[in-house]
Amino acid sequence: MTQTGATGSEPAKETARSSSADKSRPLPPADLAGVPVYCSWSGGKDSALALHHALRLGAEPRLLVTMLTEGGERSRSHGLRRELLETQAAALGVPISFGAATWAGYEDVLRRELVEAARQGLRTGVFGDIDIERHRDWVESVASAAGTRACLPLWQRSREALMREVLDLGFQAVIVAVREDALPPSLLGERIDAAMLRAFEAAGVDLAGENGEFHTFVVDGPPFSGAVEVDLGERVLRDGVWFVDLLPRHPSG
């Protein structure tokens, strides 16, 4: 894990970070203690694990930020229903906000969402990126343009180690999308386990799905007050990716 922006002396606390000169510099994860944060939120394993690490480091998550399709009904990245993400946020005990955008307008809308977070006093954002430099450059740029700074608790961790940690911590991650040329649609709705990771490794599939091989939705884990109950809906193929429609399970009667 890198310590971007760290120096040999202890960095100043959050009260001193709000100056225009340094508030947009990336924040070393070790400096999260006592810092109110927003979390970039897909609903999947990486954002959930980043949230867990932020909590363990003493951060105070105040808001989840999720991007939806232009109609505002499903998440832009994973195709998850808005209602499902709201149920997940309730189980985490963290409010959630949504921005709706086309892919072309994605960056502008996200920046506006982060500007609003900054207005609420949240000048640090937690992101779940692992080791792709162009992704890090992009999130740091967008966060900075909104007057906030990015913190990446998972940065440069081994992908295998992160996936083992997901399992060891008890996160329950359901496969909600698979790339048609990488994995079979029969995996949709399955929960990631050790046997699945071994199969991925044998097939040459990235264990963390960093190349878009698969996406997940986390239904339970350390930060959750209770499991998010779901049912499986129809499967659809869109632009070379299989998706399953995950439905929030409502109590009968």
Language model segments and positions:
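Nucleotide-activated chemistry modules centered on ATP-dependent adenylation/adenylyltransferase
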Residues: 2-5, 10-253
